[in-house]
Design a protein with these regions (language model features):
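Compact, glycine-rich, soluble single-domain proteins
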Residues: 2-63
Length: 63
């Protein structure tokens, strides 16, 4: 599978949001993170910082 770990970066702190995310959508509310089973999590007021598909890692940052 091609899931990626999603992290929220705040300064020097890297916090795991979801271990195996299949989709990330950036909305007005924040980042919507969805796994392969459809479980959703909303990270309020977050934007995409970096998507490293080689490392299967997606980094979010506060707005």
């Amino acid at each position: 599978m091609c899931e990626s770990a999603v992290y929220l970066i705040r300064g020097e702190v890297k916090t795991l949001v979801m271990q195996e995310a299949a989709k990330v959508a950036i909305t007005d509310e924040g980042a919507v993170v969805i796994d392969a089973l459809g479980e959703r999590m909303i990270v309020k007021d977050a934007d995409l910082l970096e998507a490293n598909l080689i490392k299967h890692e997606i980094l979010l940052r506060p707005r």
